[in-house]
Amino acid sequence: GDTLVSYSGSESTVTIPDGVRVIGENAFKNNDYILNVICPDSLEQIGYRAFYDCDNLQSVSLPETLKVINEGAFYYCENLKTLGHTDDGVLPKGLTSIGVKAFYFCKALEGDLVIPDGVTSLSAGLFYNGFALTSITIPDTVTSMDANGDQFANCTAVTSVKLSKNLTELPK
């Protein structure tokens, strides 16, 4: 089918086959072998905690077609450095939804974070402990931020932030 349900292999580089639209819930959870994941252009959604605690994961090439990154998708991927979009900011332009703590404790994720125009709300704990992020751009399409906050807590290398002019309230 069009959903990758589970991967339990020990390859260091995993190429997800073309035609896969969804990476399922917990599909790669706790896999310490994978270093790189190459996603197909057909990919539209990454499931709940799909890459949870993949300690050695360093890069994931996310296609521009990706629409949804669910809750905790890359939670505790402490060595994740790149999502394959270094020219256009960290995230694919097609994204419309990023779940709670999607990139929680991705402390190696580098560069200038640009939230895509399709996103309207920022979930709690989104880039918590994003120590290597250097700037954050939040487009005017974002009108709310989860009141539980910590979207960018401890992003200590950030030197520049551009906020949406349509945000009426920031979390505490």
Report the location of each language-model feature.
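Consensus positions within tandem repeat domains that build extended binding/scaffold surfaces
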Residues: 25-27, 47-52, 70-75, 99-104, ...
